[in-house]
Amino acid sequence: VAYIPAGSGNDFARGAGLPKNPKKALQLILAAQSPDKVHIMAYEEKISEKKGIAVNNFGIGLDAAIVHATNHSSTKERLNKYNLGSFSYLFSILRTLFTQKGFPILVDAGGKQLSFSNAFLCTATKHPFFGGGIAIAPTADASKPVIDFVMVERINIFKIIWLILLLMQKKQLKSKYFHHYTTNRLRIVSTTPQYGQEDGEDVAPRPFDLQFSTKNQLFFK
């Protein structure tokens, strides 16, 4: 498999250390003598009995609601014409910050049982980035056979602004409202219907019972 970045986000290119310029990416692919091993996520959603893979992240809650708002935004296509697609994402963030409510989740991170009553953002990721370059999990490494799980609690707007400032400095791990775990197996259960997103593709609101593991994929790069 080979990957040529062509969208407005290109988080996989960032996370896998690929050029964001399509021509440079193609040149590397054509010059490659053999493929490299990249660890990606395999998942199974027990309620819908759906199985699949994700190379970026799978989220429920805030990030998924933002993806839904962005993908269905009337301004996204116009902004993309001028290479300003990231602004569409920013507008969706500002709107969704005020409308997304907290929800309960149960988590099993490699045998460690966790319970959160007021989750806001809940994401399993294979590399640091989402949303077009936001380092939500700055220590994540796509070359390792592990999954990074990030959960942010629902807090008031002033604390959210402070957390965003920490996020911009990659210091969000200092916040007690930001939870980060690294594991080789992960289960997330949300009984309250929420939007989902799988590699930037929105999933209609539903309860989730997600199980994640890693698998190898060979990439020419």
Regions found by a protein language model. Give the residues of each.
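Catalytic core of DAGKc-family lipid kinases
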Residues: 2-114
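Short glycine-/acidic-enriched loop or helix-start segments at secondary-structure transitions
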Residues: 12-15, 65, 133-134, 161, ...
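Short, hydrophobic/aliphatic alpha-helical segments
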Residues: 43-47, 117-119, 186-188
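AMP-binding/adenylate-forming core of the ANL superfamily
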Residues: 53-55, 119-124
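Short, catalytically relevant binding-site loops at active-site mouths
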Residues: 62, 128-130, 156
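ATP/nucleoside-binding phosphotransfer catalytic cores, i.e., glycine-rich phosphate-binding loops
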Residues: 109-111, 116, 135, 141-221
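Glycine-rich phosphate/pyrophosphate-binding beta-alpha loops
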Residues: 121-136, 202
